[in-house]
């Protein structure tokens, strides 16, 4: 995805981070955020986030969160080469939930209204979304950071 390329291209120029913003309109947003956060603890948050976006249609309607949804996310963790035992533990760790809550509160504080949303120096960018080209996205990030 475009964001991954931009993050790699800007490495050393800007600190690019991903934050969780599970929206209440998506009933499995919190478990998905937990999966991304658990993967982040093993250095693979972007990979997990991408996997979840790519496969969203297969899990967004799952109602059995304890078994079916966690099992599916565990299979994604295995595909990505994560330590699945650590992933299972981190997935339900209260610290994971607290990190997600912190990200959500931060997003609300700076005015994030949806996902994905991009922000630079605590200011959401209105003219950048997931359909923006990598080149234009990098330009907008640099411009917003005053790095032209």
PLM feature spans:
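Structural alpha/beta surface segment adjacent to cysteine/selenocysteine redox centers
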Residues: 1-78, 140-144
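C-terminal cap of thioredoxin/glutaredoxin-like
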Residues: 1-7, 74-148
């Amino acid at each position: 995805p475009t964001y991954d390329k931009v993050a790699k291209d800007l490495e050393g120029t800007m600190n690019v981070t991903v934050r969780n913003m599970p929206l209440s309109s998506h009933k499995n947003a919190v478990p998905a955020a937990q999966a991304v956060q658990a993967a982040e603890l093993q250095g693979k948050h972007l990979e997990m986030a991408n996997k979840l976006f790519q496969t969203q249609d297969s899990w967004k309607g799952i109602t059995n969160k304890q078994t079916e949804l966690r099992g599916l996310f565990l299979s994604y963790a295995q595909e990505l080469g994560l330590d699945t035992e650590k992933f299972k533990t981190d997935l339900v760790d209260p610290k994971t939930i607290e990190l997600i809550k912190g990200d959500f509160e931060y997003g609300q504080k700076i005015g994030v209204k949806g996902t994905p949303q991009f922000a630079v120096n605590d200011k959401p960018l209105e003219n950048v979304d997931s359909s923006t080209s990598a080149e234009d996205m990098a330009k907008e990030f640099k411009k917003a950071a005053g790095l032209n």
